[in-house]
Amino acid sequence: MLETLYKEALDRKNNPKEGSYTNYLFDKGLDKILKKVGEEATEVVIGAKNADKTEIANETADVLYHLAVMLVETGVSPEDVEAVLRARQGKQSNVHDRKEVTDY
């Protein structure tokens, strides 16, 4: 689905449509896009905290959409992200190698 969202956002950037929210974001620039990513991520956290599955699903969809717009704006493709995920797959966490946090 991220690939589909990415392609749609890329198409909208290359073929602007008047009144498009996606074009509004591109016109406002990276700072606006990042602000929206942060806002939507916070709303996912709130939905999860409230154990509201509908809200979690809706807000996660919003996060994915805004991430796709951010990827287009920054020139990072879903394939780039997938390559990182594939490289990480199967690796053990290094949590046991980290120093214990004792000073809060």
Curated annotation (Swiss-Prot):
Gene3D superfamilies, A to Z: MazG-like
Q: Which residues form the signal peptide?
A: none
GO MF annotations in UniProt: ATP binding; phosphoribosyl-ATP diphosphatase activity
Per the record, its GO cellular-component terms are: cytoplasm
**Could you tell me the Gene Ontology terms of the biological process aspect for this record?**
L-histidine biosynthetic process
Q: In which pathway does it act?
A: Amino-acid biosynthesis; L-histidine biosynthesis; L-histidine from 5-phospho-alpha-D-ribose 1-diphosphate: step 2/9
Q: Which UniProt keywords apply?
A: Amino-acid biosynthesis, ATP-binding, Cytoplasm, Histidine biosynthesis, Hydrolase, Nucleotide-binding
**E.C. designation(s):** 3.6.1.31
Query: Which protein family is named in the record?
Result: Belongs to the PRA-PH family.
Stored NCBIfam families: histidine_hisI
Protein name as catalogued: Phosphoribosyl-ATP pyrophosphatase
Origin organism of this chain? Streptococcus thermophilus (strain ATCC BAA-491 / LMD-9)
Top-level taxonomy: Bacteria, Bacillati, Bacillota, Bacilli, Lactobacillales
Q: Which gene encodes it?
A: hisE
